[in-house]
Amino acid sequence: INYDLERKLRRYAIGNLMKYIVIGQGIVFALMYIWPTLGYRLYSLISLTRAGLMRGQIWRLVTFVFTPPSSSPIFILFALYFYYMIGLGLENQWGKVRFNLYYGVGMLGSIIAALITGYGSNMFLNLSLFFAYAALYPDEQVLLFMFLPIKMKYLALADAALYLYYFIVGGASTRVTIVLCLLNVFLFLGGDIINTIRRESRYWKTRYNFRKAMRK
């Protein structure tokens, strides 16, 4: 994104976007947990479905981002904090305009996938944030399960392998959903991901050659 375009879009960009999204997800989850009848009714009204859109419920084009990423009271705290931190990190690195565009392209991919398959969610949209953060900060450590330190790049590789498996064994709708919902990753981070793979390949090749030379 060039400077002139970024300057024009700056007035429309939402600063600290993930804060509002995480708060919305937290409110929906709290209603589902405390007042299930109202909470699940709200969940059904804000979810992204083709049938709902065809009935003119256009708010679903935006509100689906507020569906909580988990139904577990324990995991939801970790998930919301995690997504807030990586969203904040991306916005600090890119600026609010580029981060808004990245998130917006992910939303658009999710919407197109929903129109094709009948249903969409923010699962892959959230995953795209994780992949972006891992591409920018591959060596940063997080605590897996709150106690096991692991680098972001290894978590990203594990997730990528899992969704590659889903892509291979899943049906056409699964493949369409994965590709479209991760479109922002390919558009914004294709070069960074390729450079990271090349850097890691050179590292492991150098390490292998060094160990091979030491054994002689």
Residue ranges and their predicted role:
Residues I1-K216:
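A detector for small-residue-rich transmembrane helices and their helix-helix packing motifs
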